[in-house]
């Protein structure tokens, strides 16, 4: 919502970014039908981590979404916001993995049925890249449990999109963080029918009065 529509909007954006001597590194990139989604490091005067989603028609990008957060970390287990595997495996399991993450988002994140975490998370190996949370099921349970009772209250309200290729699934969720309307992009890696790794970014959604187009964040 912070960029004007069309080629003129992109030209203005690139001109503005060029003043910061930008550096971009695509860490991992995946394809899901007409969509391409990437996990990216940026240095635009400040160091940021983001997800970029593009929709293509006739070989050209026709729609774009992103979610960008200031780089933080390492987290309590020593992981950065982007390290870990980058290649999708188990391509034949794309749809079952998409379904698994969709159920996790609904049951755990939106409906907060934390007693069902074991149905989704590998109890022996769960690698966490959120800068505030350590590895493992117990750390995730603690983080989700406290997310509704402290000053950084997290509420997941609506899932807008699930993009998948093989072992990687990206969810796009609307909600609030600390009472601020926010966008949550969560990338999961799945192995043997369980979630084994997680990366994410959280970004505040600007109020409509600040939008430069009418498309919204989602």
Regions found by a protein language model. Give the residues of each.
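C-terminal and inter-domain tail/linker signature
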Residues: 1-218
């Amino acid at each position: 919502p912070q960029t004007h529509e069309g080629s003129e909007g992109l030209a203005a954006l690139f001109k503005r970014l060029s003043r910061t001597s930008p550096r971009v590194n695509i860490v991992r990139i995946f394809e899901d039908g007409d969509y391409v989604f990437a996990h990216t490091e940026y240095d635009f005067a400040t160091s940021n981590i983001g997800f970029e989603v593009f929709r293509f028609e006739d070989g050209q990008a026709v729609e774009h979404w992103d979610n960008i957060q200031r780089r933080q970390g390492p987290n309590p287990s020593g992981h950065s916001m982007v390290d870990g595997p980058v290649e999708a495996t188990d391509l034949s399991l794309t749809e079952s993995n998409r379904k698994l993450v969709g159920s996790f988002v609904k049951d755990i994140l939106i409906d907060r049925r934390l007693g069902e975490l074991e149905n989704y998370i590998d109890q022996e190996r769960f690698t966490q890249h959120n800068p505030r949370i350590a590895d493992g099921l117990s750390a995730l349970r603690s983080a989700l449990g406290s997310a509704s009772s402290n000053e950084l209250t997290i509420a997941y309200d609506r899932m807008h999109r699930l993009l998948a290729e093989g072992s990687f699934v990206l969810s796009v969720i609307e909600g609030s963080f600390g009472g601020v309307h926010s966008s949550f992009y969560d990338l999961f890696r799945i192995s043997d029918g369980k979630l084994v790794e997680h990366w994410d970014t959280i970004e505040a959604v600007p109020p409509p009065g600040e939008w430069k187009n009418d498309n919204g964040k989602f």
